[in-house]
């Protein structure tokens, strides 16, 4: 966090110098109240590959099954890479940064919310499935959004109007991450999981 103050000072003294700073989340920085270079920085999000980037190497089936994360795409064992990504990045980073008090509840939340991928998000239903308070699930969703792992797309309406209840749709940022988080039972039909 202290580096941002140094970057700010250098930018103030020499406008021609530019920096590229990377990170997985600004959540910890915001909580610490550090200098976020207001008005001097651009926020760019890096997303998984898109078909056009891969051109002839693109496989629709591979993209739907394993996703398009650069670390996973083309790996000898994509499933192992996805599991490692989820364990190391999502679970361990959340635990290390102390973002959740009960990692067991958060793990149940990840499994429960995986069933909401591509659907309207009912925070109350997910909270009931996890056995936690609604406010806890709201916080968990905010963590996933801050880590750029998921997003909620708001309901679209042509005209501005007051809606008493409107649930946005929940999406994980990558199909491979979603499929790896989603629990599979012995009677699950893969085509049903895929939405066919």
Ranges and model annotations:
Residues 2-20:
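Conserved Walker B catalytic segment
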Residues 3-4, 30-32, 55-56, 75, ...:
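Short glycine-/acidic-enriched loop or helix-start segments at secondary-structure transitions
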Residues 9-10, 27-42, 57-59:
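Short regulatory helix/loop adjacent to the ATP-binding pocket of P-loop NTPases
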Residues 18-24, 45:
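Structural recognition of the conserved hydrophobic beta-strand(s) that form the central parallel beta-sheet
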Residues 24-29, 49-52, 177:
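Conserved nucleotide-binding/hydrolysis micro-motifs of P-loop NTPases
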Residues 56-89, 95-99:
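Amphipathic alpha-helical "lid/sensor" segments that cap RecA-like P-loop NTPase cores
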Residues 80-196:
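Accessory nucleic acid-recognition modules appended to NTPase machines
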């Amino acid at each position: 966090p202290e580096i941002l103050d140094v970057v700010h000072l250098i930018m103030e003294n020499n406008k021609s110098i530019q920096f590229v700073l990377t990170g997985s989340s600004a959540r910890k920085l915001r909580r610490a109240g550090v200098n976020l270079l207001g008005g001097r920085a651009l926020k760019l999000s890096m997303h998984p590959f898109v078909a056009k980037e891969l051109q002839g190497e693109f496989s629709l089936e591979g993209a739907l099954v394993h996703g398009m994360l650069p670390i996973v795409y083309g790996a000898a064992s994509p499933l192992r890479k996805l599991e490692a990504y989820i364990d190391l990045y999502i679970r361990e980073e959340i635990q290390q940064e102390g973002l959740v008090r009960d990692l067991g509840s958060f793990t149940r939340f990840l499994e429960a919310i995986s069933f909401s991928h591509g659907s309207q998000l009912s925070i109350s239903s997910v909270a009931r499935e996890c056995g936690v308070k609604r406010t806890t699930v709201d916080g968990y969703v905010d963590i996933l959004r801050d880590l750029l792992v998921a997003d909620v797309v708001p309901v679209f309406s042509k005209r501005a109007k007051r809606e008493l209840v409107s649930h946005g749709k929940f999406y994980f940022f990558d199909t491979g991450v979603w499929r790896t988080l989603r629990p599979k039972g012995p009677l699950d039909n893969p085509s049903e999981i895929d939405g066919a």
